[in-house]
């Protein structure tokens, strides 16, 4: 900044002009459009099938920490990765938050669905204006489907043993 003022004060000095040019050519770091600051992390819970996920959302750069692993390390399947990032992509906040999650129970698909619900709920607490977009996309609806219980007298939930008339 001092070089720029010297160049303005003394236009005959060629060294000051090149210094001013160097200052103006310095790259400007991209600042996110909206900066989020919370008193404490946003905490939500998502559930699907037998999976339960506790999500912590903090302002950051878009990193995922799932049981101490990265998103790619925990969910190698690209379909699950897309499913999880969908709420962030919908509201265009992929690089605005870091997500820390504790996942337990169920399998990969159930955990991915539970994580998606937890992230969507956390995004609403961070920015209530995003609720209509997330609701329209169906990210706020808890999937009620679960495994039906096995009944006695049957082999599975609905499969009956073979019936013989005689």
From Swiss-Prot:
InterPro entries: Ribosomal_Su5_D2-typ_SF (IPR020568), Ribosomal_uS9 (IPR000754), Ribosomal_uS9_bac/plastid (IPR023035), Ribosomal_uS9_CS (IPR020574), Ribsml_uS5_D2-typ_fold_subgr (IPR014721). GO terms for cellular component: cytoplasm; small ribosomal subunit. Residues 135-166 are annotated as: Disordered. The keyword Kinase does not apply. GO terms for biological process: translation. Residues 152-166 have a biased composition (Basic residues). One of its GO terms (molecular function) is structural constituent of ribosome. The keyword Ribosomal protein applies. Pfam families: Ribosomal_S9. It comes from the Bacteria. Keywords: Ribonucleoprotein, Ribosomal protein. Residues 142-151 have a biased composition (Basic and acidic residues). NCBIfam families: PRK00132.1. Belongs to the universal ribosomal protein uS9 family. PANTHER family: RIBOSOMAL PROTEIN S9, SMALL RIBOSOMAL SUBUNIT PROTEIN US9M. This is Small ribosomal subunit protein uS9. The gene is rpsI.
